[in-house]
Curated annotation (Swiss-Prot):
The lineage of its organism: Bacteria, Pseudomonadati, Pseudomonadota, Betaproteobacteria, Burkholderiales. Part of the 50S ribosomal subunit. NCBIfam families: L6_bact. This is Large ribosomal subunit protein uL6. HAMAP family: Ribosomal_uL6_B.
Amino acid sequence: MSRVGKAPIALPKGAEVNVAAGVLSVKGPLGTLSQPIHSLVKVNVENDTLTFAPADESREANALQGTMRALAANMVKGVTTGFERKLNLVGVGYRAQLQGAALKLQLGFSHDVIHEMPEGVKAETPTQTEIIIKGADKQKVGQVAAEVRAYRPPEPYKGKGVRYSDERVILKETKKK
């Protein structure tokens, strides 16, 4: 049995869970998220706890039990506290600002890069060189952060580019004669 899958999920106050027609939906103060449940996994909701069990003894069912439990835990955390990812812009003239719901980036190109935010994801710019991406869906928040970083990833010689706030860029030495 999966060690991750065995652990129950405690539901905090304000989080409601529904299991209907093979879909797990979690509702909370920050919104509603839903995820289809695989047929090899059984879900039980009782007394503010959510538990998962494999439908049979196959190896695939054990693996999917842990996967479903991890996805559900992320959904519960997302609708109650939310997720955020911080990005830093390092480089002369690199700036970010909000333009409505879109993010306008000046990254050394001859044009400004405008990144539209998907449904359920918000961006903040506390300073011109800092971006905070927030949302209830962990996968969407991470995907948007990766897309913004991909416009100008940190280069290995000076470290200029868009990087995660907790990312360490290892700088190379230049060639010497």
